[in-house]
Amino acid sequence: MQIYNTLARAKEEFIPRDKGHVSMYVCGPTTYNFIHLGNARPLVFFDTVRRYFLYKGYKVDYVQNFTDVDDKIINRAAEEKIDPLELAQKYIQEFFVDADALNVMRADTHPKVSEHIEEIIDLIKRLEDQGHAYVVDGDVYFAVRSFAEYGKLSGRSLEDMQAGARVEVDPRKKDPMDFALWKAAKPGEPSWDSPWGSGRPGWHIECSAMAEKYLGNGFDIHGGGFDLIFPHHENEIAQSEAACKAPFARYWMHNGFITINQEKMSKSLGNFFLVREILAKFPPDVVRWYLLSTHYRSPLDFDDEKLVMSGKGLERIKTALRLLYEAMDLPVYEGEDIQGAENFEETLQRIRLEFEKAMDDDFNTALAISYFFDLAKEVNIYVGKLNSKVTLEMRKILDQAHTLIKDFNRVLGILKEDKMTGKLLIEMAGADDTLTEGLVQLIIKIRQEARSKKDWSTADAIRDGLKELGVVLEDTPQGVRWKKQG
């Protein structure tokens, strides 16, 4: 298996730290808002990486954190006049709603920054004791020039970084590129006691401490988006390797951006679509299929037409699966097998090998999906030759085709499985949720029109009627939100 390692700037053979065991840390969201489609890409892709390792028989330790202490959370909480940790917990719960819809498996561990302050303080103390950190007025900074290899992940020198960075000049720092490990407490912000006074962690130290706790040093794969290469992952390497005198992570994987009109999708640019907005228009399986339809290191430009095309492509798989299930229900008789049965069995073996070859080449999901289409085509051809009955041998081959489709799906995670029958659910439950979302949004629009006309009785009647049906409306400064009661 070959993985493109950002650190080496090349594909390298994957050799796990521990035989038969893969350790992965993927940077999770800063929980101050619902996730957008750009956040969903690494979520779905690294879930697929994990699934493929499991398919190959590895034991996988998968850690994905939540940054629940951050400037963005504090600012958003101030706007909404609630406690920052309460706001963060709210959006952690909302994250799981979206992740579950996209059929993303829960990580083995989902650590939160607020629950790992002790580990963070311990790591900062080690850096201070070794001369890599210094204290100024209750703030603690990492001295980047104390780590000789700073810049090895991004491939840039400190001078180049400083010239191109938008760094606020702080005369208290020894170097403009030094970054905060600990921030002194400010009124209204979450804070914890520390050897340097009350305060809270900086962003970068959080992942270093949590990755070390759950995976140890020299773990296998650290993942995230391209935008995390610098400064976040560069700083993680500096902190962890300066403190431990050992490699931090061995393979660094970064996915490309989702773009709109060739511009990165991001909350800061305001050109983003929330996952739940997309799921109001398209079924979850189609959205996941779309996210895997392009190689993970390539940019993925967003528009509705691409999702429509993804839906049509996925329907080809579902059509083959429907036909296969019909054939598997045919009665069995004793007789001669249809011509070409042996060739079909060989074709199944070939397609499996091609699929694995694609995934072994830096997780090329786009190519792997093309072999899924080949499989659907071959299933259609074989099933089309069947009559009203099948032999035991033919039934065995149909079962092999079903197993192969399930194995491909086990890796790509597109369709959910009926635990009782073992069959894949061709129509996902999320399709009903999509209809519900659309209907509720339509009703909200009608209510808003009534409110704009000062027709308060109609607006109240709509709100009360929805509440009786288990749908609660919340009027917020950002607009009307709804949720299912209970």
UniProtKB/Swiss-Prot annotation:
GO-annotated cellular components: cytosol
Q: Where is this motif: 'HIGH' region?
A: 29-39
Q: Does the keyword RNA-binding apply?
A: no
InterPro entries assigned to the protein according to its UniProt record, in alphabetical order: Cys-tRNA-ligase, Cys-tRNA-synt_Ia_DALR, Cys-tRNA/MSH_ligase, CysS_C, Rossmann-like_a/b/a_fold, tRNA-synt_1_cat_dom, tRNAsynth_Ia_anticodon-bd
Task: Describe cofactor binding as the record notes it.
Answer: Binds 1 zinc ion per subunit.
Which region is the signal sequence? none
Q: Which residues bind Zn(2+)?
A: 27, 207, 232, 236
Residues noted as binding ATP in the record, renumbered to the chain:
267
User: SMART domains, alphabetically?
Assistant: DALR_2 (SM00840)
Compartments in which it is found: Cytoplasm
One biological process term from GO is: cysteinyl-tRNA aminoacylation
**Listed Pfam families:** CysS_C (PF23493), DALR_2 (PF09190), tRNA-synt_1e (PF01406)
**Keyword Nucleotide-binding included in the entry's annotation:** yes
Q: According to the UniProt entry, what is the EC number of this protein?
A: 6.1.1.16
Name the SUPFAM superfamilies for this protein. Answer: Anticodon-binding domain of a subclass of class I aminoacyl-tRNA synthetases (SSF47323), Nucleotidylyl transferase (SSF52374)
Required cofactor names: Zn(2+)
GO terms, molecular function: ATP binding; cysteine-tRNA ligase activity; zinc ion binding
Alphabetic keyword roster: Aminoacyl-tRNA synthetase, ATP-binding, Cytoplasm, Ligase, Metal-binding, Nucleotide-binding, Protein biosynthesis, Zinc
**PANTHER family, sorted:** CYSTEINE--TRNA LIGASE, CYTOPLASMIC (PTHR10890:SF3), CYSTEINYL-TRNA SYNTHETASE (PTHR10890)
What HAMAP family does the entry give?
Cys_tRNA_synth (MF_00041)
Quaternary organization: Monomer.
Task: List the protein's name.
Answer: Cysteine--tRNA ligase
